[in-house]
Amino acid sequence: MLLNKITFFERFEHDILSGAKTITLRDEAESHVITGQILPVSTFETDRWFCDIQIIDVTPVKLTELTEMHAKQENMTLPQLRDVIAEIYPGLEQLFMIRFMILSQ
């Protein structure tokens, strides 16, 4: 079933709105989006809407395959990105990279 919205931790809101964060790495349960799909974006903590995004593409990627390019698209260093992934998805190897662009804020 396709997602009908997506949430991000509040700490990522500024990076998303500024265009510094252009991908999100998710587990399989949160990977059910399709190219061209438009989603409202809310904060995870309070479910406050802050923008709409359009999905550019979805690509499977393993944790061990993450590079500096992925980190840059997340507006982090590679060690920071790996730490965040370990915090959110402990022990998970298979991720899905969702590339997106902001439509409205």
UniProtKB/Swiss-Prot annotation:
It is an enzyme of class 3 (hydrolase). SMART domains: ASCH. GO terms for molecular function: hydrolase activity, acting on carbon-nitrogen (but not peptide) bonds, in linear amidines; N4-acetylcytidine amidohydrolase activity. The keyword Glycoprotein does not apply. The active site is at K21, T24, E74. Keywords: Hydrolase. It catalyses: N(4)-acetylcytidine + H2O = cytidine + acetate + H(+); N(4)-acetyl-2'-deoxycytidine + H2O = 2'-deoxycytidine + acetate + H(+); N(4)-acetylcytosine + H2O = cytosine + acetate + H(+). InterPro entries: AC4CH (IPR008314), ASCH_domain (IPR007374), PUA-like_sf (IPR015947). SUPFAM superfamilies: PUA domain-like. Residues 7-93 form the ASCH domain. Pfam families: ASCH (PF04266). Catalyzes the hydrolysis of N(4)-acetylcytidine (ac4C). PANTHER family: UCP029143 FAMILY PROTEIN. Belongs to the N(4)-acetylcytidine amidohydrolase family. HAMAP family: ac4C_amidohydr. This is N(4)-acetylcytidine amidohydrolase. The lineage of its organism: Bacteria, Pseudomonadati, Pseudomonadota, Gammaproteobacteria, Alteromonadales.
